Regions:
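Structural preference for solvent-exposed beta-strand-turn elements
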Residues: 1-199
Length: 199
C-alpha cells in the first residue's frame, strides 16, 4: 500500500516514522511541527485528510474540524546526515526504557559541563552500562547484553527523553542501536531516531 513518511530534524536530532496512508498524489511538504501537532491534537479521532495546494497552503481536515497552515519549500528542509553508524547492540525496549528512566534524573542541566548533560553508554561485549551524573548525584545501571561492537558514547539527554517517550509499549520489541564516534541511531519497528553525540 501507500505510505506517509514524517521526518523531524533540528540539525542535532532527527526522528523518522512511516505510516500507512491512502495517497492520492505523491509529493512532499514541510509544515511547522508545533502548529501541526497542535492542530492534530484538537481533531476528533478518525481519518485525517491532508491536502497541499501550489500556493503554499496546506489544508488539514477531520470530520467538521478544518485548519489551514502555510507550508514551506521542501528544498529548504535540511538533509538528514548519512551517519555511517555501525550496528552495535540489540536490546528489548522494556530493558532500555527502564535503564533510561533509572538514570535520566541525574543528568546535569549545566551547559558549562557538556559531558554531564548527557548519558554515557558504555557498551562492552557482555554488558551495557548507562551512567548519568551532575556533580551531586550519580546513577549507574548495568544489564547483560550480547554486543556486536564495543564503544563508549555520550548521548544528549534530549535524545534519551525522546527515545524513552517513543519506545513501543510492547516491552518485548527490539531496539537496534548503531553508533560511531559522532552519531547514534536507535531503530524500532515504528521509529528511527538519530542524534549527534556529545564529544
Amino acid at each position: 500500500g501507500f505510505q506517509l513518511t514524517l521526518t523531524g530534524y533540528d540539525l542535532e536530532m532527527g526522528i523518522v516514522t512511516t505510516i500507512d496512508a491512502n495517497v492520492k498524489e505523491p509529493g512532499e511538504v514541510v509544515l511547522n511541527a508545533k502548529l501541526l501537532s497542535s492542530m492534530v491534537s484538537r481533531m476528533p479521532s478518525g481519518q485525517i485528510n491532508i491536502q497541499s495546494a501550489e500556493n503554499g497552503k496546506t489544508t488539514i481536515q477531520s470530520g467538521v474540524a478544518q485548519f489551514e497552515i502555510q507550508s514551506m519549500n521542501p528544498t529548504d528542509f535540511p538533509e538528514l546526515p548519512n551517519t555511517g553508524a555501525e550496528e552495535t547492540l540489540n536490546i528489548k525496549t522494556g530493558v532500555l526504557r527502564d535503564m533510561i528512566e533509572r538514570t535520566l534524573y541525574a543528568v546535569s542541566q549545566d551547559e558549562k559541563k557538556p559531558a554531564h548533560t548527557g548519558e554515557l553508554f558504555e557498551i562492552s561485549p557482555d554488558k551495557l552500562t548507562v551512567v548519568a551524573l551532575d556533580g551531586y548525584r550519580l546513577a549507574i545501571v548495568e544489564r547483560p547484553v550480547e554486543a556486536i561492537k564495543e564503544i563508549r558514547i555520550i548521548v544528549p539527554s534530549k535524545t534519551m527523553n525522546e527515545v524513552s517517550h517513543l519506545l513501543a509499549n510492547d516491552d518485548e520489541e527490539t531496539v537496534h542501536i548503531s553508533a560511531n564516534r559522532r552519531y547514534v541511531v536507535f531503530t524500532t519497528a515504528g521509529y528511527t531516531i538519530m542524534s549527534r553525540l556529545i564529544e
